[in-house]
């Protein structure tokens, strides 16, 4: 009987140590989400936009100079199956995959996180509850209510470490959201508040863009309120790539494949001409 008690005590002790070790893994493990690490360090982070389901195009963008990919599922017709195929075929590229989901719904965020992305971008956040939902469905208990799937893209300790590596980006795009900016920025688990330039103008009755928007005091006042609420809360501030030199902004939605092609095609063509032709892509010689 004494031996049984000793064995039972040893088993209980081992289980307790295992649980403690697993808990510590999530707290002390270095971030494999390199984009989130840069976010936390206050460095500039650029996410290149991906709007088409071509795996080769995705891999080209994901292995460029970008910190992360902004996989667009709000304003595109891509399916989760197509996005999953892209991510799977590209493995673990340099740029960390983020997805802009259509809404802060369990089904959308569950699918996105199960695909292996390490960033959830939620559009049109007007309320504290919607920001809380983004965190809730993106993170495992005790930080959220995400159901556990079988993803092992980021290692065997994925379940224990991913909460610390999951970036949450909240987009404020309407006057209602601006009015709630202080409360939204105070939601635990949020990393970035993104001032959505285009829709901020669209939903406020100031739909013009670019140079025409400069000097609009109403529009600029909304941007300033988002700016101040975000930095006051100790979070990082996001915006369009055109704002990369704007004070306080460190997270940006960058250009997509078309911009890379526009910028790179002349270099490739001129380089080929200078070398007298050479190989031409996948064309047979």
What are these regions (language model features)?
Residues 1-11:
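Bacterial N-terminal signal peptides that target proteins for export
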Residues 12-15, 20-285:
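Expand to "…catalyze enediolate/carbanion chemistry for C-C bond making/breaking, isomerization
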């Amino acid at each position: 009987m004494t031996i049984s008690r000793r064995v039972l005590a040893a088993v209980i002790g081992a289980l307790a140590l295992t649980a403690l070790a697993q808990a510590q893994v999530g707290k002390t493990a270095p971030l494999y989400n390199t984009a989130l690490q840069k976010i936390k360090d206050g460095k500039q982070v650029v996410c290149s936009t991906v709007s088409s389901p071509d795996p080769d195009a995705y891999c080209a963008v994901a292995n460029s100079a970008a910190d992360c990919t902004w996989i667009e599922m709000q304003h595109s017709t891509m399916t989760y199956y197509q996005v999953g195929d892209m991510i799977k075929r590209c493995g673990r590229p340099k740029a960390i995959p983020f997805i802009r989901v259509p809404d802060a719904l369990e089904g959308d965020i569950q699918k996105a996180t199960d695909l292996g992305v390490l960033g959830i971008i939620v559009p049109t956040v007007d309320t504290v509850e919607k920001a809380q939902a983004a965190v809730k469905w993106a993170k495992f208990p005790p930080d959220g209510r995400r159901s556990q799937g079988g993803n092992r893209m980021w290692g065997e300790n994925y379940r224990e470490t991913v909460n610390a590596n999951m970036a949450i980006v909240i987009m404020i795009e309407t006057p209602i959201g601006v009015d709630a900016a202080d409360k939204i920025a105070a939601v635990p688990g949020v990393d970035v508040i993104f001032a959505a330039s285009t829709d901020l103008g669209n939903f406020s009755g100031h739909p013009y863009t670019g140079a025409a928007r400069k000097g609009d005091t109403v529009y600029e006042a909304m941007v300033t309120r988002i700016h101040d609420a975000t930095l006051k809360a100790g979070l990082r501030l996001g915006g369009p790539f055109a704002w990369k030199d704007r004070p306080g902004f460190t997270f940006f939605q960058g250009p997509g494949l078309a911009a890379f092609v526009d910028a790179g095609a002349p270099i490739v063509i001129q380089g080929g001409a200078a070398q007298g032709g050479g190989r031409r892509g996948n064309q047979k010689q």
